[in-house]
């Protein structure tokens, strides 16, 4: 990017948009500060005290980073240009001179400005020897890596990998990058999670939105159009650099807070970016370590589709503590610790140098929908000022950096008009066009999803009659309310589990420690003689994956009248095994049992054979391989990849169940020294088991995985499915001489992985839309609950007429207006939209007037919803005070 020098305006490419303009301005300021140029080439022949040109920053934003020390004229060029002064044209961008010693002759300054040459450069704004540096239009241009669409020095540093762009710290990146200070890149709300952590002091100032009168249902949990805003922390000084030492000239500047840039065309500030201060290179201070570049707390600016916050974010640049160590400085130019792992390094999940998980999973900041107080400032207001003493609530100094907490009470945004009461938006178009049913409800969630959730709730709350099932104990260890999830085996049962070799049973139980439901897998008659296997159990407890049922606890008990070993897992209500979903049909094996293999011309086509769709099989493959990849990465083996131990919830969601059972049941005393000695063999067996499961799904029958039917089963797969599925099954079932990995099947999955990801995200969109329909229902219920506590109360404070007088009488008439409307013929008028609309207007307190007619129709009261809201609030607060004993 070419940065214009002097008082020139930004080049056309940089002035195209507010964001690009601010970025170009910031690069010019930062490069000029680090090179000591100061924005205009100066030489020894320049006269002191003469400002040759207009300052382009002051001309654009009425503010400048350098304050009074700026070597350009701080006047409005529109008011009239002084003789000999001029502004560069946008169409003639100037190159940033990088060659030292190239001086300008008198009267030949860039841009055609004429006048006495400037005097020597002030030493505090540059490095020694920079006063004589200059450059011409033909001088070499300095390219900023990664700016204006330029290629990044490290190809692995994509914009999606970091929320901020960083340039050269302690040997990070190429040698050119180390010459520039860190620059904050403006990020949108979708890529900038809030960084306001627990270390920040809570803001205790008065917030109108959290007061008791903010909403009628506030006592039950307020919900308004303008949601509450989190406190922001404004950092004094540089973005990523320590404060300038006391006594330096830069600290004595009039505006020590830096340049506030980025205004939109209309003059309304859309963002305020705090650019880096001039580095004190002349002080020869040591280069700070990476830990000093990490803010101790802060918040990010979040831009909504309606408005943008006018304070930028203080994002963390580095997350790993070792990035600032001397070891990183020894990297070769161009090397980066941030590159992701290659497939050869799999199955590592995330490189240790990636951004911290807290940044990726932090709760979204509700401040993104708020309008800051300064948004209501008129457009002709002069330069924005730093937080004044009246605005600052409190401040904190951490590691030499001062943070200010300011009042964040929202103010209306100029030019924006919002509805004055809650309005239900239509269905999102990307969801409306994918609706499978034309008669889907508009104001409530889909019936299918509702029924599924109700079934889950019923199963979770199910209990047994202890008199009918006395064999089930009332309490096992710290679990109670046991409910069998499978038919209990008879007392004299001799048949053992085909998987574990022991009689097993499964229960739902509630843990008395946290009151959460869990699934208990009981191993009958097992005595745990070696507790060293608990090392493997502890490793299983640490695994959290969306396709694995997490193991929580393993304990022994005699509550079942015999020694038993119990595994406690997360409970997923409504789940069924793959065996019962796909292989429980008695006709599924008809293709293999009714006729001999080889007595027909070939397998029947898929639609006649009743086979599963290939897309469903690939969805299962992606989930099962993902679970295996996580397990193998942790150094463990699944060992239960079987249709009877794979749970299916919803439609296609898989979870591997009963993990860790084999590690305890088959633990050998010879493994005392190394419990993980045989894991490599078990992992290879997992791949074979995965191949059998996939082949059974492709044949839609367990008979296809039998050894005598294996060849014909592969012929069935070859005719009815793609070659990729056939190759995957052959790879998993074929015993090879080398060690295989679950990552080897990724090329066979190929682009189908993105198909499954797209389907999952579309499903998420549909569920979010259903959730959005239910957002307002809870609020309206709270309003009705509060209204019901007021209306028709027989007595209050020994006054039997309390509900029929004063404000309560208005609320009684409003209740009749809400629910007891009749038609001209006297028939009941039932209209849900009327009820919802009136409740929303009451909650918002709109100035609309309504007529309330008494029951005898002798009086008509004309009131506004704002009057009714005031009556509602006062009356309910009176009830609350009486309930708390304050009356």
UniProtKB/Swiss-Prot annotation:
It comes from Mus musculus. Residues 111-139, 280-307, 321-393 are annotated as: Disordered. Residues 789-887 are annotated as: Knob domain. Pfam families: Pan3_PK. The gene is Pan3. It is found in: Cytoplasm, P-body. The N-terminal zinc finger binds to poly(A) RNA. This is PAN2-PAN3 deadenylation complex subunit Pan3. ATP binds at residues 521, 570-577, 644-645. One of its GO terms (biological process) is deadenylation-dependent decapping of nuclear-transcribed mRNA. Residues 281-290, 298-307 have a biased composition (Polar residues). Residues 463-750 are annotated as: Pseudokinase domain. InterPro entries: Kinase-like_dom_sf, PAN3, Pan3_PK, Prot_kinase_dom, Znf_CCCH, Znf_CCCH_sf. The keyword Nucleotide-binding applies. Belongs to the protein kinase superfamily. PAN3 family. HAMAP family: PAN3. Regulatory subunit of the poly(A)-nuclease (PAN) deadenylation complex, one of two cytoplasmic mRNA deadenylases involved in general and miRNA-mediated mRNA turnover. PAN specifically shortens poly(A) tails of RNA and the activity is stimulated by poly(A)-binding protein (PABP). PAN deadenylation is followed by rapid degradation of the shortened mRNA tails by the CCR4-NOT complex. The modification Phosphoserine is found at residues 354, 361. Keywords: ATP-binding, Coiled coil, Cytoplasm, Metal-binding, mRNA processing, Nucleotide-binding, Nucleus, Phosphoprotein, Zinc, Zinc-finger. One of its GO terms (molecular function) is protein kinase activity. The keyword ATP-binding applies. Homodimer. Forms a heterotrimer with a catalytic subunit PAN2 to form the poly(A)-nuclease (PAN) deadenylation complex. Interacts (via PAM-2 motif) with poly(A)-binding protein PABPC1 (via PABC domain), conferring substrate specificity of the enzyme complex. Interacts with the GW182 family proteins TNRC6A, TNRC6B and TNRC6C. Interacts with YTHDF3. A zinc finger (C3H1-type) spans 49-77.
């Amino acid at each position: 990017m070419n940065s214009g020098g002097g008082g020139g305006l930004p080049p056309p490419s940089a002035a195209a948009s507010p964001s690009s303009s601010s970025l170009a301005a910031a690069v010019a300021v930062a490069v000029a500060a680090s090179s000591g140029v100061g924005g205009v080439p100066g030489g020894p022949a320049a006269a002191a005290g003469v400002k040759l040109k207009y300052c382009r920053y002051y001309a654009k934003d009425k503010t400048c980073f350098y304050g009074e020390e700026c070597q350009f004229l701080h006047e409005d060029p529109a008011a009239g240009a002084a003789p000999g002064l001029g502004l560069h044209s946008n169409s003639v961008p100037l190159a940033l001179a990088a060659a030292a010693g190239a001086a300008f002759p008198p009267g030949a300054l860039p841009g055609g400005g004429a006048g006495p040459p400037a005097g020597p450069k002030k030493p505090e704004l540059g490095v020694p020897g920079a006063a004589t540096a200059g450059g011409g239009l033909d001088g070499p241009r300095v390219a900023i890596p990664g700016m204006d669409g330029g290629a990044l020095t490290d190809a692995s540093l994509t914009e999606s990998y970091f929320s901020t762009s960083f340039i050269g710290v302690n040997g990070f990146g190429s040698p050119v990058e180390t010459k520039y200070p860190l620059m904050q890149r403006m990020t949108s709300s979708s890529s900038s999670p809030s960084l306001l952590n627990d270390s920040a002091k809570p803001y205790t100032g008065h917030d109108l939105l959290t007061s008791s009168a903010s909403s009628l249902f506030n006592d039950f949990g307020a919900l308004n159009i303008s949601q509450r805003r989190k406190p922001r922390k404004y950092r004094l000084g540089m973005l990523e650099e320590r404060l300038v030492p006391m006594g330096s000239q830069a600290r004595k500047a009039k505006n020590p807070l830096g340049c506030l840039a980025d205004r939109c065309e209309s003059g309304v500030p859309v963002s305020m970016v705090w650019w880096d201060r001039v580095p004190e290179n002349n002080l020869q201070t040591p280069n700070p370590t990476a830990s000093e570049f990490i803010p101790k707390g802060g918040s990010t600016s979040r831009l909504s589709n309606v408005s943008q916050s006018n304070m930028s974010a203080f994002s963390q640049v580095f997350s790993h503590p070792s990035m600032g160590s001397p070891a990183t400085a020894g990297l070769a130019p161009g090397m980066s610790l941030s590159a992701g792992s290659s497939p050869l390094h799999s199955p590592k999940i995330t490189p240790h140098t990636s951004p911290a998980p807290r940044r990726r999973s932090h709760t979204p900041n509700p401040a993104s929908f708020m309008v800051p107080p300064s948004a209501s400032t008129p457009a002709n207001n002069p330069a924005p000022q730093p937080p004044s003493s009246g605005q600052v609530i409190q401040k904190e100094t951490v590691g030499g950096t001062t943070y200010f907490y300011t009042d964040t009470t929202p103010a209306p945004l100029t030019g924006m008009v919002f509805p004055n009461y809650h309005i239900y938006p239509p269905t999102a178009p990307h969801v409306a066009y994918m609706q499978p049913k034309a008669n889907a409800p508009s104001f409530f969630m889909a019936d299918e999803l509702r029924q599924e959730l109700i079934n889950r709730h019923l199963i979770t709350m199910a209990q047994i009659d202890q008199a009918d099932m006395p064999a089930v104990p009332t309490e096992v260890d710290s679990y109670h309310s046991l409910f069998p999830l499978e038919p209990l085996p008879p007392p004299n049962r001799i048949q053992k589990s085909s998987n574990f070799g022991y009689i097993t049973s499964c229960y739902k139980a509630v843990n008395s420690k946290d009151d959460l439901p869990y699934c208990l897998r009981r191993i009958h008659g097992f005595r745990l003689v070696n507790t060293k296997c608990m090392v493997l159990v502890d490793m299983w407890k640490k695994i959290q994956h969306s396709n694995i049922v997490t193991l929580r606890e393993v304990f022994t008990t005699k509550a079942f009248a015999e020694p038993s070993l119990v595994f406690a897992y997360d409970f997923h209500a409504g789940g069924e095994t793959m065996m019962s979903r796909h292989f429980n049909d008695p006709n599924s094996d008809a293709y293999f049992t009714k006729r001999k293999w080889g007595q027909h011309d070939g397998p029947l086509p898929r639609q006649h054979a009743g086979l599963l769709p290939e897309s469903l099989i690939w969805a299962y493959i992606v989930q099962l391989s993902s679970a295996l990849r996580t397990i193998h990465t942790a150094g463990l083996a699944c060992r239960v990849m079987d249709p009877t131990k794979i749970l299916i919830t919803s439609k296609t969601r898989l979870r591997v169940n009963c993990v860790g059972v084999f590690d305890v049941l088959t633990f050998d005393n010879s493994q005392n020294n190394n419990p993980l000695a045989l894991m490599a063999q078990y992992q290879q067996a997992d791949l074979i088991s995965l191949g059998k499961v996939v082949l059974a799904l492709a044949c839609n029958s367990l008979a296809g995985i039998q050894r005598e039917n294996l060849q014909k089963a592969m012929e069935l797969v070859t005719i009815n499915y793609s070659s990729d599925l056939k190759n995957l099954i052959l790879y998993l079932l074929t015993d090879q001489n080398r060690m295989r990995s679950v990552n080897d099947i990724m090329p066979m999955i190929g682009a189908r992985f993105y198909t499954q990801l797209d389907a999952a995200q579309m499903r998420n969109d549909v569920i979010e839309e259903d959730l959005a329909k239910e957002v307002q229902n809870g609020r309206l219920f709270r309003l009705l609950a509060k209204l019901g506590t007021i209306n028709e109360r027989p007595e209050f404070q020994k006054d039997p007429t309390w509900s029929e007088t004063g404000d309560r009488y208005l609320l009684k008439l409003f209740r009749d207006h809400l629910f007891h409307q009749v038609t001209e013929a006297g028939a009941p008028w039932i209209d849900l939209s009327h009820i919802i609309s009136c409740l929303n207007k009451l909650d918002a307190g709109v100035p609309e007037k309504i007529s309330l007619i008494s029951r005898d129709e002798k009086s008509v009261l004309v009131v506004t919803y704002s009057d009714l809201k005031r009556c509602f609030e006062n009356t309910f607060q009176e009830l609350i005070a009486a309930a708390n004993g304050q009356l």
